[in-house]
C-alpha cells in the first residue's frame, strides 16, 4: 500500500490511533500534526513521515472542539492548531470525528484557541479586545513550534469565514 494519511491531535485522535493500529498494513504510514500524535503512532507500529517527505496525503483525520449545524468547526484546543491546518490543507479529504456533545447551534461556547508567536501575544490580544473578544493567555503552554496559545471568549462567530479572515490578518 502506498497511501499516506494525515493524523490530527487530541483525545479523540488518541482513541482513533488505538483502533488504527489494527489496520496498519492497509496503508503506508502517516503524517502527524503534533509530536504527541507522532509518538503514539510510532508506539503503535505505524510509520510516520514529515510532510516534506510525502507527495500526497489521501485523508486527514482529526477531532474538533465544536461543530456548528453548518459544519463550521472550532479546532486547536489541543494546542496543535498551526500544524493541524497545514497537514489538513495538504490532504485530499478531511474526516472529522466528533460525538453529539460537540454539536452546537452557534460556535463560541468553547473558547477559540489562537496560536501566536510569543513576541506578538500582547499585540494580538489588543486586536482581539478591539474586536470584542476576551483573550486569556494559556500560561505555561508552548506548541511544538514554540508558539503560545490565546484562548478567546466572547467573539461574534456568526460569520466564521469572515472572522477567520480577520484573525488571520492580525500579524503574529
Question: Where are these predicted regions, by residue range?
Answer:
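N-terminal active-site beta-alpha-beta segment that forms phosphate/nucleotide-binding
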Residues: 1-66
Amino acid at each position: 500500500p502506498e497511501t499516506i494519511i494525515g493524523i490530527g491531535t487530541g483525545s479523540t485522535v488518541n482513541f482513533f490511533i488505538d483502533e488504527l493500529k489494527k489496520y496498519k498494513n492497509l496503508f503506508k504510514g502517516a503524517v502527524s500534526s503534533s509530536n504527541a500524535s507522532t509518538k503514539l503512532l510510532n508506539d503503535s507500529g505505524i510509520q510516520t513521515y514529515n510532510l516534506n517527505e510525502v507527495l500526497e496525503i489521501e485523508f486527514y483525520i482529526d477531532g474538533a472542539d465544536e461543530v456548528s449545524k453548518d459544519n463550521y468547526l472550532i479546532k486547536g484546543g489541543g494546542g496543535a492548531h498551526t500544524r493541524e491546518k497545514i497537514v489538513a490543507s495538504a490532504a485530499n479529504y478531511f474526516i472529522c470525528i466528533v460525538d453529539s456533545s460537540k454539536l452546537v447551534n452557534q460556535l463560541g461556547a468553547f473558547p477559540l484557541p489562537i496560536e501566536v508567536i510569543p513576541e506578538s501575544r500582547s499585540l494580538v490580544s489588543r486586536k482581539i479586545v478591539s474586536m470584542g473578544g476576551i483573550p486569556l493567555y494559556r500560561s505555561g503552554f508552548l506548541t511544538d513550534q514554540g508558539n503560545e496559545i490565546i484562548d478567546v471568549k466572547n467573539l461574534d462567530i456568526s460569520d466564521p469565514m469572515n472572522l477567520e479572515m480577520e484573525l488571520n490578518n492580525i500579524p503574529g
